[in-house]
């Protein structure tokens, strides 16, 4: 099954700062959290692997099983993410969302072990042919337990930490840090102690530290689970801005769909390790409703539209926000709510 949280924390630090990982790896193995065997090592170094789908990330017929697990966590999963996409991956707990995201960053198979069939390409790089440090220049990962990714005392030190380890000179570190902090609205806080930041600010700091490495893709694993409704709204405003203004490709594993709706271009619904459907938010939520898959995650407003349609009403616009819902209802009643002929 999944690794215990202590292991995930270590793996998370490994993704952002790979050299931290290796002492943790020995610890996990000695405590039997990670497998010594039941792992297929494929040396693809001599092969020329090319992705078959267009896209900044191409997941191709990926089947993956954690060490010693009886069932695959992912079963023949294929997904193409294009540059500039804003993708929400949703589904019940245990659907495979986190596993899919970790495969994009190369944490699967490099750090989790296990067996993998199929391939994942990130920025054209086959994840089995590149280590996580190579992939980190293309893809930035923010874990659900984002505080575990903070390893220093002040905001400025946190921003400099990974960049220093990449060997960037001080003036380049200052430039990148300043620009990244401004993008997440934390400018001027370099001297602040990390312990004085709110939960939302800590999360923004982790995002800024990842942005300073200038990746093309940002991956968030359930980023809003510890935030209040206002924090969730602010988070999506920030990430929506990074997608729109900076052109970053964004992939989020998420349960709270309502706040994501104004920004998401694509939804992906997972269940039991498979992708059930991917498409526009509206297409995917309709399938969730008609097939009774993770219905509880459908925003109340959109569910109200689907239920009104069941009794014969038609609407000009989907209820993706309150303004559209009000307009559509008023127009529908003005027409008498008749079904189109």
Where are these regions (language model features)?
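Membrane-embedded alpha-helical hairpins and interfacial helices in multi-pass inner-membrane proteins
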Residues: 1-38
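The feature captures the beta-strand-to-loop junction immediately N-terminal to the Walker
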Residues: 90-92
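Conserved ABC ATPase "signature" region
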Residues: 171-189
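Conserved ABC ATPase signature
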Residues: 193-197, 201
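Catalytic Walker B motif of ABC-type/P-loop ATPase nucleotide-binding domains
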Residues: 218-221
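H-loop/switch region of ABC-family ATPase nucleotide-binding domains
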Residues: 254-255
């Amino acid at each position: 099954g999944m690794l215990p949280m202590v292991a995930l924390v270590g793996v998370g630090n490994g993704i952002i700062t790979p050299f931290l990982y290796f002492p943790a790896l020995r610890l996990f193995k000695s405590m039997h959290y990670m497998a010594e065997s039941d792992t297929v090592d494929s040396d693809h170094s001599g092969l020329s692997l090319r992705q078959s789908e267009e896209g900044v990330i191409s997941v191709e017929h990926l089947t993956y099983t954690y060490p010693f697990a009886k069932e695959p966590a992912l079963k023949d999963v294929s997904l193409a993410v294009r540059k500039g996409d804003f993708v929400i991956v949703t589904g019940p707990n245990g659907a495979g969302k986190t596993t899919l995201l970790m495969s994009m960053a190369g944490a699967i198979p490099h750090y989790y072990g296990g067996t993998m069939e199929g391939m994942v390409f990130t920025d054209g790089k086959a994840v089995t042919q590149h280590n996580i440090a190579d992939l980190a220049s293309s893809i930035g990962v923010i874990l659900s337990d984002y505080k575990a990714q903070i390893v220093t005392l002040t905001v400025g030190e946190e921003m400099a930490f990974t960049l220093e380890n990449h060997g960037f000179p001080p003036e380049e570190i200052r430039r990148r840090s300043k620009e990244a902090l401004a993008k997440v609205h934390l400018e001027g806080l370099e001297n602040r102690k990390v312990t004085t930041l709110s939960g939302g600010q800590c999360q923004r700091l982790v995002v800024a530290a990842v942005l300073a490495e200038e990746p093309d893709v940002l991956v968030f694993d359930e980023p809003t689970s510890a935030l209040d409704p206002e924090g969730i709204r602010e988070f999506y405003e920030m990430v929506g801005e990074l997608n729109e203004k900076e052109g970053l490709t964004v992939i989020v594993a998420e349960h709270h769909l309502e706040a994501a709706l104004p920004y998401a271009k694509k939804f992906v619904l997972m269940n039991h390790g498979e992708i059930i459907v991917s498409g526009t938010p509206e297409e995917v939520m309709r399938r969730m409703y008609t097939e009774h898959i993770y219905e509880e995650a459908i925003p109340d407003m959109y569910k109200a539209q689907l239920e009104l349609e069941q009794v014969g009403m038609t609407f000009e616009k989907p209820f993706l926000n309150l303004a559209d819902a009000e307009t559509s209802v008023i127009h529908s009643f003005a027409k008498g709510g008749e079904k189109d002929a």
